[in-house]
A protein has these predicted regions:
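Acidic, His/Gly-enriched loop-helix segments that form or flank divalent-metal centers
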Residues: 1-71, 75-80, 89-98
Length: 99
């Protein structure tokens, strides 16, 4: 299980870990924090070495899963709702309030 703010720039989690441990890399750090590329391209390529990668950053109406990446920012801080994901089973506690 991995957790990042926005997305993973690498094809595998171990590669990202190696890059981050090698020292500061502004491009990698910015991608992890700000990228919306996967969502914009509907890229369902999984990140190898993980069961699931949990990300946020881009508010959506519903949780969206692309490959093994779970986009769980549903705008709870604004006008949306908070999404709760049970990590053991990868099930949403309340997929969409009111439904």
């Amino acid at each position: 299980m991995g957790l990042l703010h926005a997305d993973c720039p690498c094809a595998s989690w171990p590669t990202l870990c190696e890059q981050l441990q090698a020292g500061p890399d502004k491009d990698v750090q910015e991608y992890c924090q700000w990228s919306r590329r996967r969502l914009q391209r509907d890229d369902d390529t999984p990140v190898a070495g993980l069961r699931a990668l949990i990300v946020g950053h881009t508010p959506l109406q519903r949780v969206r899963v692309l490959g093994n990446i779970w986009h769980i920012d549903t705008g709870g801080w604004s006008r949306g709702h908070f999404s709760l994901l049970e990590l053991g089973s990868l099930t949403l506690a309340n997929p969409m309030p009111g439904e």
